[in-house]
Amino acid sequence: MVRVKICGITNLEDALFSVESGADAVGFVFYSKSKRYVSPEKAREISLNLPPFVFRVGVFVNESLESVLDIAFHAGLNAVQLHGDESVEFCERLNEKIMVIKAVGISEEQDVRRALEYRKFPVLLDTKVSGYGGSGKVFNWSVVLPYRDQFRYLILSGGLNPRNVERAIEMVRPFAVDVSSGVEISPGKKDHNLVREFIKKAKGL
């Protein structure tokens, strides 16, 4: 069964609803320029109130190794998701302390080949945009297909929503899917009906 991560969590209500609806993971964005930014203290508060066995992931962009680790341990994270220009070497050093998920922006086949450089880690494929962060737009999933089996753990993101997630899973066969804006009322506030529907369709329930 495909795993589901609900990202851009900013409040306990949305986090608990996501988990109760079947989400395997929740994501906190620690990139200060994001509309979904949450402070490490707020993330810690939410994290401490979640049930056991829920995966807590923090999103970072070009932070120092020390800063990532400080926030990760303070907020009670299980993994960090790196959306910047972090090198393979940086990821390896960080991975000695906490699980690393490397996000790579995709618009064409050469981007997928670049993502393969990180395949020793779980790799999240997102839609390529100028700057950093999500776009809420879908990329051409077909560019992934020739390389799909070279990724050990492939996480699909970028413009997913309850209307397209079944098709995305059927086509790409990811280990997990990641959604944020596709289940929102406004940035940082989830639409609970959409969250429930997304998880149900992603897991084939």
From Swiss-Prot:
Similarity comment: Belongs to the TrpF family.
CDD domains referenced in this protein's UniProt entry, alphabetically: PRAI
Reaction catalyzed: N-(5-phospho-beta-D-ribosyl)anthranilate = 1-(2-carboxyphenylamino)-1-deoxy-D-ribulose 5-phosphate
A Pfam family: PRAI
SUPFAM superfamilies the UniProt entry points to: Ribulose-phoshate binding barrel
Assigned keywords, A-Z: Amino-acid biosynthesis, Aromatic amino acid biosynthesis, Isomerase, Tryptophan biosynthesis
Keyword Phosphoprotein included in the entry's annotation: no
Name of the protein in question: N-(5'-phosphoribosyl)anthranilate isomerase
Keyword Amino-acid biosynthesis: yes
GO molecular function: phosphoribosylanthranilate isomerase activity
Alphabetized NCBIfam families for the sequence: PRK01222.1-4
One BP annotation, GO: L-tryptophan biosynthetic process
